Amino acid sequence: HIILENTAQQFLIQQRSDSKESRPGQWDITAGAVDAGETSLIGALREAKEEVGLTVPSRAVRFLFRDQRPHCFHDIYYACFPFSLKECTMQASEVQALRLVSDQELIALMQQQCHRTSFYKTQLTNFLENRSKFIASCLQ
């Protein structure tokens, strides 16, 4: 998973394609499974490129936390860099719409998602509410 924030302090969310088996039509951050031989970081960067057409500068990426599940785990990354919706291209099989939202809108969205663990929701909310040091480096 990778949380993408632009220099206007807006977060990119994507609406999952209605043809997806899992959570069709749901709004979410960019996420996906890693391919064989990939690290979670490389997988997150690849998913951002494939699903929304953004090349995320590796220097802009920070690891946030790992959400451990019984049979898998989700590594959560954050990246802040200059981008706009005009620069995005949707992968039609995965994404049907894109939006930019505020930190509070993103928190509200994540809190509503029943497939997210309480640990995930708490960690993400804490990060979003206390990310000033990350924003400072992004805006330089």
Feature map (PLM): residue ranges:
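Conserved N-terminal beta-strand and adjoining loop/helix that marks the start
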Residues: 1-11
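The catalytic Nudix box helix
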Residues: 13, 29-62
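A basic- and aromatic-enriched beta-loop-alpha substructure that forms the phosphate/nucleotide-
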Residues: 18-28
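Recognition helices and adjacent regulatory flanks at domain boundaries
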Residues: 20, 46-50, 77
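Histidine- and/or cysteine-centered catalytic micro-motif in compact active-site loops
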Residues: 7, 16-18, 32, 66
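Short, solvent-exposed aromatic-acidic interface loops
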Residues: 16-20, 94-97
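Nudix hydrolase/Nudix homology domain
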Residues: 25, 63-140
